[in-house]
Amino acid sequence: MIDVNEFEYMKIGLASPDKIRSWSYGEVKKPETINYRTLKPEKDGLFCERIFGPTKDWECHCGKYKRVRYKGVVCDRCGVEVTRAKVRRERMGHIELAAPVSHIWYFKGIPSRMGLILDMSPRALEEVIYFASYVVIDAGATNLESKQLLSEKEYRAYREKFGNTFEASMGAEAIKKLLGKIDLEDETHSLKEELKSAQGQRRTRAIKRLEVVESFRNSGNSPEWMILDVLPVIPPELRPMVQLDGGRFATSDLNDLYRRVINRNNRLKRLLDLGAPSIIVQNEKRMLQEAVDALIDNGRRGRPVTGPGNRPLKSLSHMLKGKQGRFRQNLLGKRVDYSGRSVIVVGPNLKMYQCGLPKEMAIELFKPFVMKELVERGLAHNIKSAKRKIERLNNDVWDVLEDVIREHPVLLNRAPTLHRLGIQAFEPTLVEGRAIRLHPLVCTAYNADFDGDQMAVHVPLSAEAQAEARLLMLAAQNILNPKDGKPVVTPSQDMVLGNYYLTLERESARGEGTIFYGPNEVLIAYDTGHVHLHTRIAIKAGSLNNPTFTEEQNNMFLLTTVGKVIFNEILPESFPYINEPTDFNLEQVTPEKYFVNLTIDEETLKELESDSAYNSLDEKGKIDAQRTAVLRKHFESVPVVNPFRKKFLGNIIAEVFKRFHITETSKMLDRMKNLGFKYSTRAGITVGVSDIVVLPDKGEILAVAQEKVDKVQAQFRRGFITEDERYDRVISSWSAAKDEIQAKLMKSLEKTNPIFMMSDSGARGNASNFTQLAGMRGLMANPAGRIIELPIKSSFREGLTVLEYFISTHGARKGLADTALKTADSGYLTRRLVDVAQDVIVREDDCGTDRGLTIGALMEGTELIEALDERIVGRHTKKTIVHPETGEVILNKDGLIDQDVARAIIEAGIEEVTIRSAFTCNTKHGVCKKCYGMNLATGEKVEVGEAVGIIAAQSIGEPGTQLTMRTFHTGGVAGDDITQGLPRIQEIFEARNPKGQSVISEIAGTVSDITEIREGLKEITIQGDVETRKYQAPYNARLKVIEGDNVERGQVLTEGSIDPKQLLKVKDVSTVQEYLLKEVQKVYRMQGVEIGDKHIEVMVRQMLRKVRVIEAGDTDLLPGSLLDIHQFAEANADAVMDGKNPATCRPVILGITKASLETESFLSAASFQETTRVLTDAAIKGKRDELLGLKENVIIGKLVPAGTGMQRYRQIRIEKDELDTEVVSAE
C-alpha cells in the first residue's frame, strides 16, 4: 500500500486505451455474474475470480490450493491467484469494445468539449454519434467541406457522383478520426490570430475554443481519448451482489448497466463476424453507444434506463454526486469505531472538565484497553479469557475500568455541530444508569437542553490524539466563543436567578444595620436567622483580606449585604470586592462611597441618649448601638444597588479570564454555578397565576385607541385619506396602545414579583412575554405576512375569545414552519461558507504588506452599528498611534491592540485607526499572523496553522438560525420591504442583485435635474465634467439626493441596497470590501448577534480574490479567463522580467458558491457541487491538486495541513542527551 502521507499532489487526466488495459487484470467477456446453483462467480463474467481475485482469503476457485502457504500461486486448473480476498476491492477488468463509443461527459457536458475542439455544434455531434447523419472526414477532390453533415439520402447521392474520392462516415468512429486529424499547435496559432481581429460572439467562441485547445496542449491529453475503445470495469467489491434472507439477491445497479453493455457488445461482434447489413450493424452500434452512456451517466441524454418499479438506475456519475455520493458520504464523513450515543441528563455536581459516562457504555468503549490491563495485572491469562471476563462483567473489570479511564479524555458531540464548540473533550467519570451526564455550563456552547437531547461519545485512541483532546479541546479550555471573543460559558436560567436573588438589596430587611467583624460572623448570623440574605449590613473591611483595599479603607467599615459577602467568596483572591454591577467596580476598585467610619456625631448621640433603652446598655453595647445608628443614616444616603444580572455575570467571567486565564476561570465558574443552584433553590421562586396582575386602567387605554381608530375610519369613508394611510394609522394606533400598556405594566410591577425577577435577571422571559400574559397580545400577522388590523385585546391571564385564538394560530404556525425552513437554509449557508474558506489557514508570521485598512466606527446614517473600540481590539496597528494632543505614543507600529489600548485610543478622541487586515494580506493560500491579529477563542495571538477560514465560516453560519426568515410586509409605503435576516445574508454572500436595489451614480458631478416622468417614476440627471448621465429611479423609490447636490462616483441616489457588482465597476475593491462588511454586520447587529469583523473579512476576501484577464499582452494568459490575483501578478512579473508586454485585468466579485467552484483544487470543488462538470473540466486540463486545503486532504486520507497536521509541526524530533533533554526542530 502507498502511504497517503507521502503524497505531494494528485493529478487527474483522460485515460488512454493503453492505460485502461494496463490497469486491467483481464477481459470481461460474458454478462454472467454468479452461478445460481453453486453461488460461485462465473468464469469470464462480471465477478470472475480469475480476473478480480479469490472470493475467500487464500483459496482458489476450484479448491485445489487452500491456506496461506500457497500465497502467490496461480492455480493450474482454474487460473485463480491465491491471495487475500480484499484485492477484489482494487483489481479492475476491461471490456474490448467492438466499435468506438464517445464518452458522454465530454460530448454532452456544457459547454461540449468535443464540440468546441472540433468547432461543431453539439446538435451536429449528436446526429453523427447516434447514427442519424454522416460527417465528411476528408473531402478529397470534391466540392464538399470537411465536417459537413450529410443525410443518408445526400450521402448516397454523393457516393454515386464522386465514388470513393471522399471519406464520410457516422458514429463515434467518425468523430475519432476527426479528432485524430487535429494539430493542436496549428489550432492554437490560428485561434490566437483570430482573437486579434474577432469581435462579439465570434470572439467569445474563439476564447472558449482556445481554452479547450490549450488545455489539451498543455496537459498532454490526446483529444482522441475522449472516444473509448476499451471500457474499464470497476472492481466487483465496489458493485457488490449480496444474498438476502429469502434466497434472493440484491445487486448494485452498475452490474445491470455493465450487463447491458456486454450483451450489446457481444451481439455487435457476432453481427460483424456474420457480415450483417450495415443498417443492422449501425443500429447495434447506436445501442452500444447508449448502453455506455447509461453506464457512465444515466439520464444525461434521453430517458434514463430504469430498473424494477420504474426507478432510474444509479450510474457511475451518480455514485459520486450529492449527499449520498462517494465524496460526501464516504470520503468527507465516515462512521467511526469506538463511539456510542445516549440521552443526556444534567450533572450539576461535575467539574467543568468532567462528564458522566454510563458504566455499560464505558466498558464497551474502552474494551481493548481494559483487556490489555487485565492481562498485564495477571487477572487474566490471555486476551481471550480477558474478553470473557468483560462479557461476564466480572468484579475485577470495574476496578480496572476505573484506572483505564482516569486521565483518558473522551469527546462529546451534539448534532447539529454548528461551530467548533459542538464537539469538546471531557474526563469521564463512571455513573450508574444509561444516560450521559453533562455539565450545565457547557450547554450554551452545545445549544443542548435536557428534554431528550442525545449526544455521541468518541474515544481518542493514540497518545497524540489524547494529548490534543486534553490540551486543545477540553471543555475548561473553551471558555470564549470564537465568533466574538466573549465568554460562552455564562450561567443561565437557575444559576442566573440564584445569583440575582443572592445579590438583591432590600430596605429595612431583618437585622438591617447590624455590624460584623468578619465574614464568618455574617454566615453564622445568616444561618441562625438574625439577618436575611438581602439585609444591608456593615463589615470590617480589613477582615475581608482584599488586596485592592487601601490601608485606610481596611480600618473602615464596608456597606454591603449578606448575599454579597457570600457572592464575593467565589471570586479570585486579588479581585476587587464587587458591591455594585458597574464596570468601574469590576475592573478597578470598590467605589469609595461604600466605605464609612462609624464615628458618631453630636446630634445623633443626643437622640440616642434621650432613649432609656440605650442608657441601660453596658459600654460595648452602647458603642454598637451608636454605630448602628450612624449606619442607618448612611444607608439613607446610599441608594439601593441593583442586583447582578446575567450580563454582569458574563462581564465578571470575562474579567476573570482576562486576568487569570483558564484554570482560575473554570474553577470560579464552577463555584458560581454551585452558588446559583443553591440560592435559586433557597429562593423558592415559582410562578403562579396570582403573580400575573392585570392592569386596572387597561380598558381606558383600549377605549382611547378604539376612538382614534373610529375617527380614522370616518375620515377614510369621507375620502379624506387613502386606503394605505388608513391602514397605517390603524396599525400605529393599536401599536401605541400596546406600548402604553407595556410601559404602565412595567411600572406597576413590584420588584419582588417572581415573573419580574426572572425576566429582570435575564434568566427567562422578557417584557413582551409579560405584556402578553398580563396586558394584551397585540397585533398579529396573517399567513401572507401582512398585519391584521384587528388586535387581540385580551391577555392570556384573562383568556382569548374564539376569534382571537384563531387569529393567533396564523403566527404560531408560521413560526414553526419558518423555524424548520430556516434551519435547512442556515445549514446550507454554513456549508457554502466552509467550502469557500476551507483553505484559508494562517500560513506565516508576516506577509510584509505595505497596505492597511483605515477604520472608524461602523455607522448607518446616524445609527451606530459597531463602535470603534469593538472593531480594533485584537488587531495589529499598521501605523504608530499617537495621542493627538499630548503627542505621546499610545502604541507602536505592528503592536497588538488589547482592551486597555483600545480604551486609551477612545479616550484620546481618536476616531480612525489604520490596522492590518485580512483584506490587505499578501499571503498566498491563507493569511498571516499580523494581518489576522488575535485568536478570539483564546485571547492570544493567533498561531501559525490555525484554520481561520473554517472558524470564520462557523462564526457566520452558526448564528444564522437566530436570524429572521422573511421580511414582514407592513404594507403602506414602498421601501419598507428591504430584505433582512437570513435571505439578506445569502444575497450578500452570493453577490446577487439585491431586492430593492438602489441606483448609484457612475460619474462624479452635480444633480442638475429631477423630473417626474409618470406618477411614482422619477428621472435623475447628473451633470459631470465630461458627460451627463440620466438615471431612472425604481417605481415609488425614495430619493437620497435633491437638485443641486454634489455626488461622487458610486454614491447612492435612491434608498435600498447597492449591487456589489455595480459598485465594483465604478469604485475600487476596498470600497466593495468595506460595503460588504458593513452590510453583513448590519444584519447581525440588528438581531443582537455580535460577530468579529475579521471573520467577515476572511469570507469577503475569498469572494474578491479573482481577476478577469482583459488583454493578454505577451503572457500565456487567455483573455476572458478567471485567475487568482497571485497567479496574475506572477505571470505579469515574469513577462516584465523578459521585457514583454504585461496583461491587463479587472477585479471580479464571485458569490461564495461560484468562488468554491472556481477554487484551484478540483477535489474540493468536485465534493462541493456540480461534481461531473468539475471533474470533466479538471480531466481535460490535466489538473494537479496541490492538496493545500483541508477538504482535499480529508478526501485522500492525509492529515489536514492545519494545526498539528502542518508540516512544520510534524517534522519535530526530540533528541535525548545524557544530561538534559532539548527539543530540536528538524526544519
UniProtKB/Swiss-Prot annotation:
Mg(2+) binds at D449, D451, D453. Its cofactor is Mg(2+); Zn(2+). Keywords: DNA-directed RNA polymerase, Magnesium, Metal-binding, Nucleotidyltransferase, Transcription, Transferase, Zinc. One of its GO terms (molecular function) is DNA binding. It holds the Pfam family RNA_pol_Rpb1_2. Belongs to the RNA polymerase beta' chain family. This is DNA-directed RNA polymerase subunit beta'.
